[in-house]
A protein has these predicted regions:
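Glycine-rich beta-alpha junction loops
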Residues: 53-59, 101-103, 130, 197
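Structural signature of the thiamine diphosphate
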Residues: 15-66, 85-88, 154-184, 188-191
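A general structural motif
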Residues: 72-86, 126, 145-149
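Short internal beta-strands
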Residues: 52, 123-128, 191-194
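Single conserved hydrophobic/aromatic residue that forms the stacking wall/gate
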Residues: 1-7, 11, 213
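Acidic/glycine-enriched edge-of-secondary-structure segments
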Residues: 62-77, 136-143
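Short alpha-helices
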Residues: 195-197, 202-208
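Anionic-ligand anchoring segments at beta-strand to alpha-helix junctions in alpha/beta enzyme folds, i.e.
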Residues: 93-160
Length: 213
């Protein structure tokens, strides 16, 4: 944006519902400081963040020192919530696991979800456009939900009494009816696990939530 408070406000309003954090560079000598802060907030929220750089700064040459990105460790779900989730799953007659992008991005999460699925004998569905969130050759893999998804996956999750949602915010592309099948199990208990607590429960009602690292 150009250096104008009115223009800056317009840009902020355009993106405010799409990003977790916004900041504008006011002083070219502090651009790296601002960028560092924007990156940290994007990592903290596991979501996009926006930096606004006024046009008259684009061609400026400055001397800067590059600061280190500050790393941090996120808290994970509490013992009570984990115990409650374990009880829900162990007592379930028809549990289903739904893997999202977070499973792909988390080290070892695909193998962990595979081991859990085998222990529970639970079918595994994946979210829209996240077929890589579970091995396609595994006998418990049911397929993707949502647009052009798997009818088998939709039929299976429709009858679930507990759905363990891993690394997904349950957006409409993964929960809206497909092929005329209104498959999202409204009476099932939903356990949602995600790195960003702001996304938990924001799209679909959940019975138990576990923010994770």
């Amino acid at each position: 944006p150009i250096r104008s408070s009115a223009a800056s406000d317009v840009y902020k309003r355009q993106f405010e519902d799409m990003v977790a954090y916004q900041e504008e560079v006011r002083d070219p000598t502090r651009i790296v400081e601002v960028l560092n802060r924007v990156i940290m907030n994007a990592k903290r929220a596991s979501a996009p963040a926006q930096i606004n750089i006024p046009r008259d700064m684009w061609t400026q040459v400055i001397d800067i020192d590059l600061p280190a990105i500050v790393e941090f460790e996120r808290p994970s779900g509490g013992d009570n919530a984990i115990s409650e989730a374990a009880e829900m799953l162990s007592s379930s007659k028809n549990p289903i696991i739904l893997n999202g992008a977070g499973v792909v991005l988390s080290e070892g999460a695909i193998d962990a979800s595979k081991a859990l699925a085998e222990r529970l004998d639970a079918a595994v569905c994946v979210g829209y456009q996240h077929n890589d969130a579970f091995p396609g050759s595994h006998p418990l893999f049911a397929g993707p939900l949502g647009y052009n998804g798997s009818k088998a996956a939709m039929e299976l999750i429709k009858d679930a009494d507990v759905v363990l949602c891993l690394g997904t915010r349950l957006n409409p592309f993964s929960t809206l009816p497909g092929y005329g099948i209104d498959y999202w199990p409204e009476d099932a208990k939903i356990i949602q696990v995600d790195i960003n607590p702001d996304r938990i429960g924001s799209v679909s009602y959940t019975h138990l939530t576990l923010p994770t690292t």
